[in-house]
From Swiss-Prot:
Protein species of origin: Latilactobacillus sakei subsp. sakei (strain 23K) (Lactobacillus sakei subsp. sakei)
CDD domains with a match to the protein in the record: bS6 (cd00473)
Pfam families to which the protein is assigned, alphabetical: Ribosomal_S6
Function: Binds together with bS18 to 16S ribosomal RNA.
Designated name of the protein: Small ribosomal subunit protein bS6
Keywords assigned: Ribonucleoprotein, Ribosomal protein, RNA-binding, rRNA-binding
Length: 98
């Protein structure tokens, strides 16, 4: 079965210090890897003003991860844990066609 390309974008709370943010990114990259996905690229996009307030915050750090996966197990686990983690304000997983 061919691997599918996915793009995972999530918004990190600006209340985290740099060390905590790095630990969070490494943790979620590890979740993807541990569940069978290959992380191609993981980088901060930018700190941006939010269109609307989320959890009393007006800004967030956008982080983008490009992933190759044979199935959706890793993405389902990422989705489940991102919903629980209060430091991730929002997240989105998109299957890429390119």
């Amino acid at each position: 079965m061919a691997q599918s390309k996915y793009e995972v974008t999530y918004i990190i709370s600006t209340t985290l210090d740099e060390e905590s943010k790095t630990a969070l990114v490494n943790r979620f990259d590890g979740i993807l890897k541990d569940n069978g996905a290959e992380v191609v690229d993981s980088k901060d996009w930018s700190k941006r003003r939010l269109a609307y307030e989320i959890n009393n915050q007006h800004e967030g750090i956008y982080h983008i991860v490009n992933v190759l996966a044979d199935n959706d197990e890793a993405l389902n686990e990422f989705d489940r844990l991102a919903k629980i983690d209060g430091a991730i304000l929002r997240h989105m997983i998109v299957k890429r066609e390119d």
